[in-house]
Amino acid sequence: VYGDITADKIPEIPELLTPDYVDHTFRRKNDENIIGIAYDTVAPVYTDHNKCNIITISGADNMGRTNFIKYFALQMLNSEIDTHIYIADDFRRKLSDIGQENVSYDLDPDEFIQKIIMIEVLLEEKYKRLIHQENPEKEITLIIINSQEVYTAISDSKDALNALKNIMGKYKVLNVYLLFGAVPNAQIAYGSPDIYKMMKETKSILFFDNLDNCKIVDIPLAIKRKNQKKIEPGDAY
C-alpha cells in the first residue's frame, strides 16, 4: 500500500482449502461449487450443477479423498439454500463427524437402500409440482456413498438401482448432488456391477493419485506425459 494505491493481492494456493476460505476469497453462484484450485492458473475450479451433479472419487489411501468429501458437504451446509445430506458410510466411519442437523447417516446397506427408494419418492413428488408450475422448495439434496458394500447392495437390488438411475438422471434438475467415495481404482469392465458402469459413463471422476496409477479410466499417454509431477495429499486430477 502506498498512499491511496493498493497493490493487487498475489493469488496463492492455500495450504488447506476450506469452505471458509472459499467463501471469503471467491464469488460463486448457488448452482456452482468450488471443488479445488488449479495449480496452473491459481483460479478456482467450479462444477456447474446444471451440467454435472455427480462426482466419483477414486485413488490411493491417505491422499485426501475423505477430506474432499467433508469439504464438499460443509460447503453445501454453509450455503444459503437448505441442504439435506444422506450418507452411507463403511465400518471405518470416516464421515461420522460431518454434522447432525439435516444429516442422515447409515452404516447398514439394507437401510440405506430403503433411503434411496424414499429419496426417489420425495423427488418424484417435487418433480410433479415443478411440472404443474408450482414453486418447489429450492432445497439441495446431497447423497454421499462411501461404502463398497452399499455399491454391491444397490447393484443387487433392482428397485434401488432404478431409483438411483432416476435420481442421477430424471431428477437432476431438482438440485440433487451425488458423491461416490470409496470407489476402487480398478478397471470397470463388462462384468462390473452396474453402479460402477454408471459412474464411468458420467465422465466426472476426481482421481487422488498419480496418473500412471489410474486404472478406473483410460488416460491418454499425452496427458500422462504432460502431468508427470508427483502429487501430494490433497491434490487430484
Where are these regions (language model features)?
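P-loop NTPase catalytic phosphate-binding loop
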Residues: 23-203, 210
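Phosphate-binding and hydrolysis-coupling loops of NTP-dependent motor/remodeling domains
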Residues: 1-36, 44, 189-237
